[in-house]
């Protein structure tokens, strides 16, 4: 169903409000052009959500890289003794990066064969944040945009690596 299979991953994820889903549905978006731009034949992800919703309002689990063994030119027949992977998660409000890191580590250890050694090293993390469009600062920015460009901006969530924002809110 396109969901992340780490047990408990979605426990603290709030459903996207219907009003926001309707706003997202009105954003001009050409899925065919998007697929061409990123060089894929098909898009996939959590069922029941549009591509824009999956890219903005829903958490993600991303494999950033996998490597191990011989990676130079030519072929080798030696089995590698080590393999590595770098993964990241885009979290949404109310998901705690410490909790998610622990759930991921517990899950990987639970599915790994007893014959291998597994080490999970959390690197860093930040809390998700959504700026309410009812916030006076947002409304002032929206009004300024409308004055400058002659039309209202579209309210679009964008996942990003600005973990300090949730600290500003607090």
Residue ranges: model-predicted function:
Residues 1-169:
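Metal-dependent amide/peptide-bond hydrolase catalytic core
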